[in-house]
Amino acid sequence: MKLHNRVTVKTDGGPRREGTILAVEEFSEGVMYLVSLDDYPTGIWFFNELSSPDGIFVEPVVGETQAK
């Protein structure tokens, strides 16, 4: 996933929320995404772990073509 891609994020106790990627930082354990949400337009950081499917919080919006 790249800058400006539309994504959904997993948050505690609710449905997945749609947002837009504002920044991407790669680490050895996974990838951090700064995602703009409707109620947090300046963004919130979410971490996707490489080693665990339960640690995936950011996913591409289904059915949208992602920018390259």
From Swiss-Prot:
One Pfam family matching this protein: DSRB
Domain of life, source organism: Bacteria
Family: Belongs to the DsrB family.
Protein name: Protein DsrB
Source organism of this protein record: Sodalis glossinidius (strain morsitans)
